[in-house]
Structures are given as C-alpha cells and as structure tokens.
Amino acid sequence: MTDTAIIETLRTKLSIAGGRHLYAVLGSYPQLAKFSSKLLQAKTTEGETFPKPVSVNSGILASIPDQEFRGLVEDEARRPEPTAKHVAQAFEKFLRDTLLAKGLVVLERMELVFAYHLELNHLRTLAADDYRILLLLPGKRDRGKVVLFPEAGEATYMLPTNLIADNNLWELGR
C-alpha cells in the first residue's frame, strides 16, 4: 500500500470509539522513515497531528538506572534470564507510561523487544478503547506470516499470527 492509503485507512480506524486498537505498518527501515515523515504531516479525524514516533529501545534503556544497567551488562553473558526479565519489566513500564500519557502512540525501534523475546500480548491488551498503538516494524508478509528483520537470514522473527488483526496490518509498497 502507499503511505497515503495507509494513513487514510488508519485515520478512519482511529475514529472508531471502542475495541482493539493495535495497528502495524511493515516495511524496510528507509520506507518506515519516509512513512514516519508523512505521518507527522497528516492530521487525525479530530484535526490533531499524529504523534512523533517513540523509540522503544531508548525508552527501555532510559528506564533502567545507570548503575543497574552496568550490572546487567556485566552479568548478561553468565546469567541472561535476569537481564531478559529486567528488560521485560522496563518494556511494560515504558509502554504503560507512554500510552497513559498520550492515548495514541507510534512505536518504532523495537529491536530489544524481539532480541529478548519479550511478551507482546501487553501491546494487544493495552491497545483498547481510548488507547491506540501504531507499530512501525521492519518486516514483510511472506506466505501468510509476518517476518520481521527479513534481511537477518535465520535470525528473523515471526510476529504471532493473532497479535494484530489482518485488517490492522499494512505493508508499504515496494
């Protein structure tokens, strides 16, 4: 789909009051950057500008105090589970704080979420009624599945099929 078509469809869906509001746009990093620029120029049906995309990686790292972060980095190779648990807690806190403050949030740069195989259902649970989440994901559709980081070869990540409704998931044109 084109940037404009996705934005128009998104505007319509965001105007619906109730229900699940988890959306995603797939594309390459350059395509997502271009889409972000166009999204920032667009207006919602209420006449407001779309929010600037927020880096999930930065949000997670910012929520971990420096001293604690140093300890996690030093221990990660020997004990990866506590680090993953800590990153998961930081992700959930960042997500709740960001969403509650804004109502509509555009999330990008989520590599830490996938690197640590964090639970994604929090996104779906929180994106309901007055809270809306748009994910900008580096990926593509492939044989009915959503493949993230397709250039990574065997290190790709498959998005769970039931996470985002098919009609709330758009792929930028190639």
Q: Positions of the model-derived regions?
A:
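Glycine-rich P-loop/Walker A and Walker A-like loops and their local beta1-loop-alpha1 context
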Residues: 1-47, 118
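Residue-level preference for the first positions of well-ordered beta-strands
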Residues: 20-24, 102-106, 132-134
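Conserved beta-strand scaffold positions in the cores of enzyme catalytic domains, especially
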Residues: 22-24, 50-55, 156, 166-171
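Short beta-alpha junction loops
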Residues: 28-30, 59-61, 137-144
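Structural alpha-beta junctions
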Residues: 41-52, 125-134
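AAA+/P-loop NTPase substrate/partner-engagement loops
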Residues: 48-71
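Conserved nucleotide-sensing/catalytic segment adjacent to the nucleotide-binding pocket
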Residues: 64-105, 109, 116-125
